[in-house]
């Protein structure tokens, strides 16, 4: 997305600040937003991780662009499932989540607490990481193995369980099951305390790349189970991790899932529009926060189905061609 001319940038900044102050109309829609009832709190993710990096950058962008007295609070969390619990429970006003988890949580929720999307951010790819010198090649080889499926509260533990079910193993078919976050799983694989671990993140994920720099790894190819998973859960798609991403022997077929930026229906249209408008004004900063965010743009950002876009976000996308 190309940057705005300086005069336009100043005009939009003034409009954005007015949106949170509740005193001006935003763009062609001429809406009159009100200030948030509570300070912005963003449910982020684990450290190190793309979620927490993007959440911190968004907090800085919103503080600067919207003239807030202080940066929004960023919460370190286990990931998507916890983020959605925080959002729907009112402890967070903004959250990042995998779209599958968001859609599951949103089922049956109506009214002010209904989760609504501001934007599709980027796509996560599920990694199943093993040592390259191991005999593990497919999910079926993990039968009886020591495997970390990710921590409770993360978005990738449900994916791990669905993949294992599709492979005919299930969680009970593992030899030992651990629920480790990425740093702990990384350390356990290095120390030979586990044989494999699941992780879902942008490509490349820094923690996996650092591991691959010190320990030759392989990602299990998921091609033999992807059709079965997608038949049951069409929200997923097929992704590929190129060989040069982590120095792999070859490209690997993986499961892909979209990540979305969310608020609830309780947020007024002007504030929602101001948040996403400011984010796109500084999209290059998001890309600097994580290589995964390079793909964020206003054309792909509307792809949040089955989670509906917030009306304020719709206003932004409908008028984005004017920017």
Each model region followed by its residue ranges:
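N-terminal secretory signal peptides
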Residues: 1-10, 18-28
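Bacterial signal peptide processing site
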Residues: 32-34
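Bilobed "Venus flytrap"/periplasmic-binding protein-like clamshell domains
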Residues: 39-65, 70, 74, 124-191, ...
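Pocket-flanking alpha-helical
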Residues: 60, 73-112, 128, 183-189, ...
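A structural signal for short loop-to-beta-strand junctions that line the ligand-binding cleft
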Residues: 111-121, 147, 245-253
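Short Pro/Gly-enriched coil loops immediately N-terminal to beta-strands
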Residues: 118-125, 212-213, 223, 253-256
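A bilobed periplasmic-binding-protein/Venus flytrap-type ligand-binding module shared by bacterial periplasmic
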Residues: 125-136, 232-236, 248-270
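An extracytoplasmic/periplasmic, membrane-proximal ligand-sensing/linker region
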Residues: 180-184, 190-191, 201-214, 219, ...
């Amino acid at each position: 997305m190309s940057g705005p001319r300086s005069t336009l940038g100043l005009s939009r900044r003034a409009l954005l600040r007015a949106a949170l102050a509740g005193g001006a109309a935003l763009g062609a829609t001429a809406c009159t937003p009100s200030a948030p009832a509570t300070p912005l709190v963003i449910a982020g993710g684990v450290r190190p991780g793309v979620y927490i990096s993007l959440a911190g950058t968004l907090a800085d962008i919103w503080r600067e662009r919207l003239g807030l007295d202080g940066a929004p609070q960023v919460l370190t969390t286990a990931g998507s499932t916890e983020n959605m619990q925080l959002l729907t429970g009112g402890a967070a006003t903004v959250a990042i989540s995998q779209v599958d988890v968001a859609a599951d949580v949103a089922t049956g929720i109506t009214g002010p607490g209904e989760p609504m999307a501001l934007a599709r951010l980027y796509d996560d790819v599920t990694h199943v990481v093993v040592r390259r010198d191991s005999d593990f090649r497919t999910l079926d080889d993990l039968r009886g193995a020591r495997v970390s499926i990710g921590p409770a509260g993360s978005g990738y533990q449900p994916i791990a369980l669905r993949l294992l079910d599709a492979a005919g193993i299930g969680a009970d078919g593992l030899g030992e099951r651990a629920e480790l976050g990425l740093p702990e799983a990384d350390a356990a694989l290095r120390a030979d305390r586990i044989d494999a671990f699941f992780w879902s993140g942008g490509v490349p994920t820094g923690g996996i790349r650092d591991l691959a720099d010190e320990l030759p790894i392989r990602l299990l190819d998921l091609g033999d189970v992807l059709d079965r998973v997608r038949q049951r859960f069409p929200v997923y798609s097929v992704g590929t991790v190129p060989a040069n991403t982590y120095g792999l022997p070859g490209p690997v077929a993986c499961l892909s899932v979209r990540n979305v930026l969310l608020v609830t229906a309780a947020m007024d249209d002007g504030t929602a529009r101001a948040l996403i408008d400011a984010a796109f004004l500084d999209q290059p900063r998001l890309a600097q926060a994580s290589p995964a965010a390079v793909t964020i743009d206003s054309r792909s950002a509307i792809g949040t189905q089955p989670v509906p876009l917030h009306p304020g976000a719709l206003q932004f996308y409908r008028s984005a061609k004017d920017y």
